[in-house]
Amino acid sequence: MATTHLDVCAVVPAAGFGRRMQTECPKQYLSIGNQTILEHSVHALLAHPRVKRVVIAISPGDSRFAQLPLANHPQITVVDGGDERADSVLAGLKAAGDAQWVLVHDAARPCLHQDDLARLLTLSETSRTGGILAAPVRDTMKRAEPGKNAIAHTVDRNGLWHALTPQFFPRELLHDCLTRALNEGATITDEASALEYCGFHPQLVEGRADNIKVTRPEDLALAEFYLTRTIHQENT
């Protein structure tokens, strides 16, 4: 089937290990309910009708993915990821076919809301550079003194946002910006930072703060609570 300008391919970098979780199992393969975190994250993407394919970049030699139902899903493509997130995303982009726009979503961010995703996807009609889901900073922010656990000063939180995923960009633009940034040794912490490095200004689309990334052991119980609450709300 030919791809239309409205069709979107999602890329999920899932080659990381997540040492802060303090488990032998990579965090994306930990379970919440009867599914892994990765499955929750991918199913949230596929629930939107514009997302026609999901490319998952896994670590070479990963034996866990093949045991999941996702391995046989007709809309899933699997590629080998790289040592760094940006390498995995580039590998995913190369497998994204002729999709004009791509979503990049964290493998360990299972609590994505469909209305947030829908608002983000409207950027393909209104923006040339795309944007990201993000949440305004509401806590008081402190900057530490270099090398010390001591407060240097309070940071003005006005205009500060927590970057979330998915992040949504024209495929060719993201590919070119990631390639240039990596070739020039820039520090790339997310896909938006590659566009920033190349002089672009992606938009911020406000999303829910409960769209958390499972990073530490305590995040697992919190994500389970959020998912259970969401399922209950959708069924009532």
Swiss-Prot record:
- Among the Pfam families in the record, one is IspD
Q: List the GO biological process terms.
A: isopentenyl diphosphate biosynthetic process, methylerythritol 4-phosphate pathway
The terms under GO molecular function for this entry are:
2-C-methyl-D-erythritol 4-phosphate cytidylyltransferase activity
> What metabolic or biological pathway is this protein involved in?
Isoprenoid biosynthesis; isopentenyl diphosphate biosynthesis via DXP pathway; isopentenyl diphosphate from 1-deoxy-D-xylulose 5-phosphate: step 2/6
Tell me the superkingdom of the source: Bacteria
Question: Which reaction does this enzyme catalyse, per its entry?
Answer: 2-C-methyl-D-erythritol 4-phosphate + CTP + H(+) = 4-CDP-2-C-methyl-D-erythritol + diphosphate
Site for Transition state stabilizer, residues: 20, 27
Q: Return the EC number.
A: 2.7.7.60
Enzyme class (EC, first level):
transferase
Q: Which UniProt keywords apply?
A: Isoprene biosynthesis, Nucleotidyltransferase, Transferase
Q: Cite the Gene3D superfamilies for this sequence.
A: Spore Coat Polysaccharide Biosynthesis Protein SpsA, Chain A (3.90.550.10)
Name the site position(s) for Positions MEP for the nucleophilic attack: 157, 213
CDD domains attached to this UniProt entry: CDP-ME_synthetase (cd02516)
Description of how the protein assembles with itself and partners: Homodimer.
Q: Which family does it belong to?
A: Belongs to the IspD/TarI cytidylyltransferase family. IspD subfamily.
Q: Which HAMAP family match?
A: IspD
Protein role: Catalyzes the formation of 4-diphosphocytidyl-2-C-methyl-D-erythritol from CTP and 2-C-methyl-D-erythritol 4-phosphate (MEP).
Protein name, per record: 2-C-methyl-D-erythritol 4-phosphate cytidylyltransferase
Give the organism, scientific name.
Answer: Escherichia coli O17:K52:H18 (strain UMN026 / ExPEC)
